[in-house]
Amino acid sequence: MDISAGIQASLAGRYASALFELAAEEGVVTAVESDLDKLHAALGESDDLKAVTNNPEISRKDQASAIEGVAGVLGLSPLTTKFLGTLAANRRLSKLGDMIRAFRTIAAAQRGEVTADVVSAHPLKDDQLESLKTKLTAREGRTVKLSPTVDPDLLGGLVVTIGSKRIDGSIRTRLNTLANAMKG
């Protein structure tokens, strides 16, 4: 299995690669990816969960029991639950977001997909996301999976990042460009 050296070079990448290889051996890559999506959503919604994963003052044991409880509530697979326990034992839960991103990248690469991070000022409607996905798929020549987020600071427009390519059509950038041009 050919996994990018760039991903493996990071701590998060090494953990994500190990999880991917275990999931592939057990034939549960899709289930683990679904688990990580649930976990990512929970991290985004719960300040308490973020605090548990990022607070170094919480003991390993308390982190492990809290994360085990979260895994139970979310209905995560045994492999994902064990992985989270390992992260807690090794004090690596603070890197969970990076590990989720790295796992998604590895899984998408294995499927021949690319992930496009789409940042917009307001939540995009389903038809807008589908239209964007169609256009990006045509442009990239392979299946594009969208990962939408909202950043009100953009004011309007979109910023799309696919790998190292960035398409910035945000109003914020246009205003900054105009301001710099006016400064002379």
Curated annotation (Swiss-Prot):
SUBUNIT field: F-type ATPases have 2 components, F(1) - the catalytic core - and F(0) - the membrane proton channel. F(1) has five subunits: alpha(3), beta(3), gamma(1), delta(1), epsilon(1). CF(0) has four main subunits: a(1), b(1), b'(1) and c(10-14). The alpha and beta chains form an alternating ring which encloses part of the gamma chain. F(1) is attached to F(0) by a central stalk formed by the gamma and epsilon chains, while a peripheral stalk is formed by the delta, b and b' chains.
Keywords: ATP synthesis, Cell inner membrane, Cell membrane, CF(1), Hydrogen ion transport, Ion transport, Membrane, Transport
Cell compartment(s), UniProt: Cell inner membrane
Molecular function terms, GO-annotated: proton-transporting ATP synthase activity, rotational mechanism
Gene behind the chain: atpH
Physiological role: F(1)F(0) ATP synthase produces ATP from ADP in the presence of a proton or sodium gradient. F-type ATPases consist of two structural domains, F(1) containing the extramembraneous catalytic core and F(0) containing the membrane proton channel, linked together by a central stalk and a peripheral stalk. During catalysis, ATP synthesis in the catalytic domain of F(1) is coupled via a rotary mechanism of the central stalk subunits to proton translocation. This protein is part of the stalk that links CF(0) to CF(1). It either transmits conformational changes from CF(0) to CF(1) or is implicated in proton conduction.
Protein name: ATP synthase subunit delta
Family matches, as InterPro entries: ATP_synth_OSCP/delta_N_sf, ATPase_OSCP/dsu
Family: Belongs to the ATPase delta chain family.
Cellular component terms (Gene Ontology): plasma membrane; proton-transporting ATP synthase complex
Membrane topology per record: Peripheral membrane protein
A Pfam family reported for this protein in Swiss-Prot or TrEMBL: OSCP
